[in-house]
Amino acid sequence: MKKNLFVVASPLQIINANEAINYFSLINNVFVVIYNSNDIHNIQIDNILKNIKTDEVIKIKPSRNGKFFEYVKIIRYLKKYLYNYLFIGDMGSINRVIIPNLKKDKVFLIDDGIGTIDYYNNFLKNSNINKYKFSILRFLLLGFKINIKDSINLFTYFDFNKNNNIEIVKNNLTCLKNRLNSSSNNFYDDDIFFLGQPFDACKKLEEYKDDLHRLYKNKNKKIIYIPHRYEPKEQTELIKNLEYVEFLKLNEPVEMFFINNNIYPKYVVSHITTALITLKMIYNSSKIEYIKLEKNIVNQEIYNHILNTYEYYEKISLEQCFLDKI
């Protein structure tokens, strides 16, 4: 019997892998899970993974010597089998080698946050996927193929224009929605849930703090601040000391936290995060808004990524939160 293979490296990728299992009614599922050095990230992965029905889990842990030889060993093992579906969460090095070396019927890219938009624009839209970093060439020396001939299809909750080169299957987050229990939900009408940013988004913490203060003053509601798992320590410490903020650190993605604790958030705000999109899909009556980061306070290396995100927010009619000066 053919297997289905999932190569995942983040909590959100595993959530979306589970949605794919449900949508395509898949059995005989193998997970290759790639960990990194961030403890919160890895804890979230394990907490989600234990609730996923899998037939085999292969874990790749961080190593001082790198992951190259571990990748080689795992790819050689995976080559022994045939696959119906191959699901990948990104176009990283292991996936660029797995795709051309495994026998499978179809390849799907599942969402890894806003990064899916970048992958689509930079690689998939124009079939521009065979661009390699030098490190990929090492696999050639060991007899692996690196040229991708497969179509990389999408299982996604993002709304992309129809493309004749790829199949786009809509991920409606059905599994998450089905877990909502409206009769026992706790409605948080008097609080604002603010979702934090990763380390590379905002470079001026004082402006970041000012946005929180203006949000508090403008809305006259307590702010429950949920940090991003990659938030820098100095940002975390700054927010913790604000008297109008309740700091709430999670060991699971915010979508899972709300559902597992029967929380129905009535008001969610952030500067930039995929969770605004997923929460908008799950909680129809919630107010989901974003505060736009100005160019002068963001990391310029990712400014185009931020612009693409805000353009997509506008496309799906996500509301912008405008704050009066105080």
What is the meaning of each model-derived region?
Residues 111, 117-119, 123-195:
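A nucleotide-sugar donor-handling region in carbohydrate enzymes
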Residues 60-62, 89-92, 107-115, 190-200, ...:
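Short loop/turn segments at strand-loop or loop-helix junctions that form parts
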Residues 37-46, 95-96, 117, 201-203, ...:
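Short, charged/polar "capping" segments at the starts of alpha-helices
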Residues 191-231:
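Conserved catalytic-core segment of nucleotide-activated headgroup transferases in glycan assembly
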Residues 18, 68-75, 205-217, 304-307:
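Well-ordered, non-membrane alpha-helical segments in soluble/globular domains
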